[in-house]
A protein has these predicted regions:
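A structural-propensity feature for long, helix-poor, extended segments
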Residues: 46, 50-96
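C-terminal edge-of-domain segments
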Residues: 85-127
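Acidic-glycine-rich active-site phosphate/pyrophosphate-binding loop
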Residues: 1-8, 39-43
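A conserved regulatory-domain signal marking ACT and ACT-like small-molecule sensing domains
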Residues: 96, 125-220
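Conserved phosphate/anionic-ligand binding catalytic regions in large, soluble enzymes, centered on
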Residues: 13-33
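Short glycine-rich or small-residue beta-strand-to-loop segments that form or flank ligand, phosphate
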Residues: 12-20, 47-52, 69, 153-159
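Non-transmembrane, aqueous-exposed alpha-helical and coiled segments at domain scale
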Residues: 37-49, 74, 81, 102, ...
């Protein structure tokens, strides 16, 4: 069986505000990945809960945790419990929906975030797997469904030029700078999306170099 935890700290969980590493810290992490994918704070978010998230989100602080992550807060930020109020004051509309039936990504702690600013729309489907750790199992960008292996970190390159040479260049860059386990390409008439399941998180300097060299890069 594949080990989803990289260290004992992934099992214990992070320093956090809230009652549960799975339902609070993990939910903050899902919200933060939504913020990264969107490229900032969206104007409207609909959060679809499945499984135990749908049953216990109010009591376990999942709502304010998701909102905090969307605002870019960390798990230890003292503002986490007040995140829904802060979001409202910033003009961010966040709604929570309890869905019935099985999770589309097959995990009991599932949150699917539909995010928009009135022009751009993206979707992120994540699950909390314990100890504050999460997986991102599905993304929808420009109506293209992207299905990573789940484990973070993930690099996405959204290519409106639809040129394979761009993928080759990025692949060569990553092979030299940062190893990855798998890569995939997703195509539509308007965009190509290249997705890489990375082995390790980047240093901030490398993220800066990557974003300078390639436009439309997303590092989750």
């Amino acid at each position: 069986m594949e080990n989803r935890f990289k260290s004992v700290f992934d099992i214990i969980g992070p320093v956090m505000i809230g009652p549960s590493s799975s339902h609070t810290a993990g939910a903050v992490a899902i919200g933060r990945e939504g913020n990264k994918l969107f490229g900032g704070i969206p104007k409207k978010v609909t959060v679809h809960y499945y499984g135990s998230f749908a049953q216990t989100h109010r009591g376990h602080g999942t709502d304010y945790a998701i909102a905090a992550g969307i605002l870019g807060f960390t798990t230890s930020d003292l503002r986490v419990p007040k995140a829904p109020e802060i979001a409202r004051k910033r003009g961010v509309d966040i709604r929570f929906v309890e869905e019935k039936g099985e999770s589309p990504i097959h995990h009991p702690n599932t949150a699917i975030l539909d995010m928009t600013d009135g022009h751009k729309k993206v979707q992120l489907a994540g699950c909390s797997i314990g100890g504050g750790a999460i997986e991102i199992r599905r993304l929808v960008i420009h109506d293209i469904v992207v299905e990573p292996s789940g484990t973070l970190p993930i690099v996405l390159f959204i290519d409106p030029e639809r040129k394979i040479k761009n993928q080759r260049s990025l692949t060569s860059f990553l092979q030299q700078k940062a190893p990855f386990n798998e890569s995939r390409i997703y195509k539509s008439p308007d965009y190509y999306i290249y997705e890489y399941d990375m082995q390790n998180y980047f240093k901030s300097s490398l993220i800066g170099e990557l974003k300078k060299k390639y436009k439309n890069i997303v590092c989750l």
